[in-house]
Swiss-Prot record:
Name of this protein: ATP synthase F(0) complex subunit e, mitochondrial
UniProt-recorded Gene Ontology molecular function terms: proton-transporting ATP synthase activity, rotational mechanism
Its biological purpose: Subunit e, of the mitochondrial membrane ATP synthase complex (F(1)F(0) ATP synthase or Complex V) that produces ATP from ADP in the presence of a proton gradient across the membrane which is generated by electron transport complexes of the respiratory chain. ATP synthase complex consist of a soluble F(1) head domain - the catalytic core - and a membrane F(1) domain - the membrane proton channel. These two domains are linked by a central stalk rotating inside the F(1) region and a stationary peripheral stalk.
Sites of N6-acetyllysine modification: 34
Subunit structure: Component of the ATP synthase complex composed at least of ATP5F1A/subunit alpha, ATP5F1B/subunit beta, ATP5MC1/subunit c (homooctomer), MT-ATP6/subunit a, MT-ATP8/subunit 8, ATP5ME/subunit e, ATP5MF/subunit f, ATP5MG/subunit g, ATP5MK/subunit k, ATP5MJ/subunit j, ATP5F1C/subunit gamma, ATP5F1D/subunit delta, ATP5F1E/subunit epsilon, ATP5PF/subunit F6, ATP5PB/subunit b, ATP5PD/subunit d, ATP5PO/subunit OSCP.
GO terms under biological process: proton motive force-driven mitochondrial ATP synthesis
Length: 71
């Protein structure tokens, strides 16, 4: 097995700095996008509710026409 290679402290500092900056960026980006995604989900749920209501009404109208006395 090959022994571990000594890495310069400057390179280690650069790597950990990049890691920390990436984590910080991800956290801020997540906090920025989370409210937008919640709003999109809320709007999608409202649209789905409207579509379901329209489908229900159309189905009831179709059933009412099928059950008509004047067949």
């Amino acid at each position: 097995m090959v022994p571990p290679v000594q890495v310069s402290p400057l390179i280690k500092l650069g790597r950990y700095s990049a890691l920390f900056l990436g984590v910080a960026y991800g956290a801020t980006r997540y906090n920025y996008l989370k409210p937008r995604a919640e709003e999109e989900r809320r709007i999608a749920a409202e649209e789905k509710k409207k579509q379901d209501e329209l489908k229900r009404i159309a189905r009831e109208l179709a059933e009412a026409q099928d059950d008509s006395i004047l067949k």
